[in-house]
A protein has these predicted regions:
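Short, conserved charged micro-motifs
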Residues: 12-16, 49-56
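Solvent-exposed beta-strand sheet faces enriched in polar/charged residues
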Residues: 6, 36, 45, 77-79
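C-terminal structural segments of small proteins and small subunits
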Residues: 55-81
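Short glycine-/aliphatic-rich beta-strand segments at the starts of folded cytosolic domains
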Residues: 1-11, 40-43
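Short amphipathic alpha-helix segments
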Residues: 12-30
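Non-catalytic surface loops within mature trypsin-like serine protease
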Residues: 9-11, 48, 80
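N-terminal glycine-rich anion-binding loops that anchor highly charged ligand groups
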Residues: 31-37
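Generic leucine side-chain signal with a strong bias for well-ordered alpha-helical environments
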Residues: 14, 25, 46, 65-66
Length: 81
């Protein structure tokens, strides 16, 4: 079983990387982007048999290490293969 985990800043948290990229795009003449946020996408291969077990592993991983609960939110998609 595989999963994709998406981690982004919470609403209202400053994203300096996103701000830098947004300004760089404007400086090279690309217009029309009002808000840009840079996040992380983590792909994992899970050694489990059920979707419930996969959810438990992902939730523990995100809450204990992968995402900072003070500044980030996460969501995920489980892909059965």
């Amino acid at each position: 079983m595989k999963a994709k985990i998406y981690i982004n800043y919470k609403e209202g948290i400053l994203d300096p990387e996103g701000l830098t990229v947004s300004k760089a795009l404007q400086s090279i003449g690309i217009k029309g982007i009002n808000n840009l946020s840079i996040g992380k996408c983590i792909e994992v291969e899970l050694n489990c048999k059920t979707k419930e077990e996969a959810i438990e592993i992902i939730e523990k991983s995100c809450s204990k290490l992968l995402a900072n609960p003070n500044t980030e939110v996460y969501n995920y998609k489980i892909i059965k293969e």
